[in-house]
Amino acid sequence: MGWSWIFLFLLSGTAGVHCQIQLQQSGPELVKPGASVKISCKASGYTFTDYYINWVKQRPGQGLEWIGWIYPGSGNTKYNEKFKGKATLTVDTSSSTAYMQLSSLTSEDSAVYFCAR
């Protein structure tokens, strides 16, 4: 039996009208089932520690699912119960970057993932 793969596509967005505010995510990932992946979301144009970063999932043909948020100022997190044990949210304030690690990947994790302020 050949390998199967999981494709993760990453997008970012931000609320507000200030065009200088940006959230830049890492690129698409192709990973094996059972593996883990850590994706990044680098912020610029605002004070990183002052705003929550939310993570959202969208599977093909389905609606948006909120995964959780992290507050960079304190590192506090809140997760959707469905994603506890699946997603781990962290930040590196020195580089204004938020991270989401997804573990024990399955075909159900093949989706578009968004970070949003």
From Swiss-Prot:
Q: Where is this region: Complementarity-determining-1?
A: 50-54
Q: Which keywords appear in this protein's UniProt record, sorted alphabetically?
A: Adaptive immunity, Disulfide bond, Immunity, Immunoglobulin, Immunoglobulin domain, Signal
Instruction: List, alphabetically, the GO terms of the cellular component aspect.
Output: extracellular region; immunoglobulin complex
Task: Name the source's superkingdom.
Answer: Eukaryota
- Record field: transmembrane: none
**Chain spans, region Framework-2:** 55-68
Q: List the disulfide bonds.
A: C41-C115
The residues covered by the Ig-like domain are: 31-117
Q: Does the keyword Signal apply?
A: yes
Q: Is Signal among the key words of this record?
A: yes
Q: Give the signal peptide, or none.
A: 1-19
Start and end residues of each stretch annotated as Framework-3: 86-117
Q: What Gene3D superfamilies does UniProt report for this protein, alphabetically?
A: Immunoglobulins (2.60.40.10)
**An individual GO BP term:** adaptive immune response
Q: What Pfam family does this protein match (any one)? A: V-set
Region annotated Complementarity-determining-2 sits at 69-85
Could you tell me which residues belong to the region Framework-1? 20-49
PANTHER family per UniProt: IMMUNOGLOBULIN HEAVY CHAIN
Protein name per the record: Immunoglobulin heavy variable 1-84
